[in-house]
């Protein structure tokens, strides 16, 4: 229903317009207060790059963060990552991730980024506190913030927006009548717009999510996902249909697709109940970090990597590395 409202297919979005105007006025006032200096943003002693969205829902932001961290690491840059930690609740904040940190404490995306990149990661509702925690513990040269485009209390040097190339901006309205956290005109002020799938427009960077080999949660064994039989697909991400479509494009045809809420807590019994006799469970890598502790032998995940094309990605990376002292 939400997807139909936000796309404009359902006329119910009109009933929500008063709330959208209120959302837009409040969010606009907050941004303006920082722009005019009525509120002061905290500036870190190292450059800060924000990777965020203009819309609610999954746009492929986390793969972009992982891509950016890995690209900078290959260039010899010491990178730290901060996040709000959605879906997690720590005993105390800021929380610096360790190999023992669980998704219940830090959220699924920070744990995934930490495991994939090995970069220092910290989570806190106040992102400045997370930045300070990393700087106190690690000699990093730059901070990447996972989400937080609208978190203006943290000053930033580079802003990158990730856009779903198929859904774009829906009906274009603010939440809750539409998907927008900020209006599309905000693109004029960011440093880069990365478009996940669909067709990139002038000035935008095209991106595709490239699937790798399926990985067994228990053994780490790898195989072509099309070789797995009787698949039940599970996706607890912002836009589950994208994952199911990826499986189809790989030649894997799930018998059943189970969409879950983004950042949803997964209980062992609930996940186990999805798979019947002789079936194979295939999930996203983000779900896998929540399920690995209680995984069964027939549970697999399909990792994806961001693939950016054209000359603009290299220019963006050159611009970012030029900020590092």
Curated annotation (Swiss-Prot):
InterPro entries: LpxK, P-loop_NTPase. The keyword ATP-binding applies. SUPFAM superfamilies: P-loop containing nucleoside triphosphate hydrolases. It catalyses: a lipid A disaccharide + ATP = a lipid IVA + ADP + H(+). One of its GO terms (cellular component) is plasma membrane. Disulfide bonds: none annotated. Pathway: Glycolipid biosynthesis; lipid IV(A) biosynthesis; lipid IV(A) from (3R)-3-hydroxytetradecanoyl-[acyl-carrier-protein] and UDP-N-acetyl-alpha-D-glucosamine: step 6/6. It comes from the Bacteria. Its EC number is 2.7.1.130. One of its GO terms (molecular function) is tetraacyldisaccharide 4'-kinase activity. GO terms for biological process: lipid A biosynthetic process; lipopolysaccharide core region biosynthetic process. ATP binds at residues 55-62. NCBIfam families: lpxK (TIGR00682). Transfers the gamma-phosphate of ATP to the 4'-position of a tetraacyldisaccharide 1-phosphate intermediate (termed DS-1-P) to form tetraacyldisaccharide 1,4'-bis-phosphate (lipid IVA). This is Tetraacyldisaccharide 4'-kinase. It comes from Salmonella arizonae (strain ATCC BAA-731 / CDC346-86 / RSK2980). The gene is lpxK.
């Amino acid at each position: 229903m939400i997807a139909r409202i936000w796309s404009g297919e359902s006329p119910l979005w009109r009933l929500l317009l008063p709330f959208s105007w209120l959302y837009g006025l409040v969010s606009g006032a907050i941004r303006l207060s920082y722009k005019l200096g009525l509120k002061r943003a905290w500036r870190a002693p190292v450059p800060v790059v924000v990777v965020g969205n203009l819309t609610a829902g999954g746009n492929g932001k986390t793969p972009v963060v992982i891509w950016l961290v890995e690209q900078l690491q290959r260039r010899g840059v010491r990178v730290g990552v901060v996040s709000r930690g959605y879906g997690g609740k720590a005993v105390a904040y800021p929380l610096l991730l360790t190999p023992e940190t669980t998704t219940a404490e830090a959220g699924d995306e920070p744990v995934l980024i930490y495991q994939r990149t090995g970069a220092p990661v910290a989570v806190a509702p106040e992102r400045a506190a997370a930045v300070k925690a990393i700087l106190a513990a690690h000699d990093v040269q730059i901070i990447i913030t996972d989400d937080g485009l609208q978190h203006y209390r943290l000053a930033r040097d580079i802003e990158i927006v990730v856009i779903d190339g198929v859904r774009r901006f829906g009906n274009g309205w603010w939440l809750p009548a539409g998907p927008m956290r900020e209006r599309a005109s905000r693109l004029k002020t960011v440093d880069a717009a990365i478009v996940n799938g669909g067709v990139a427009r002038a000035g935008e960077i095209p991106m595709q999510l490239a699937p790798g080999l399926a990985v067994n949660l228990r053994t780490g064994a790898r195989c072509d996902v099309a070789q797995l039989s009787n698949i039940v697909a599970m996706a607890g991400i912002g836009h589950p249909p994208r994952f199911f479509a990826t499986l189809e494009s790989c030649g894997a045809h799930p018998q059943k697709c189970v969409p879950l809420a983004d950042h949803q807590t997964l209980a062992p019994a609930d996940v186990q109940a999805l798979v019947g006799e002789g079936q194979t469970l295939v999930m996203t890598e983000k779900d896998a970090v929540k399920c690995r502790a209680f995984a069964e032998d027939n549970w697999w995940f399909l990792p994806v990597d961001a693939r950016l094309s054209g000359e603009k990605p290299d220019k963006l990376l050159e611009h970012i590395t030029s900020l590092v002292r």
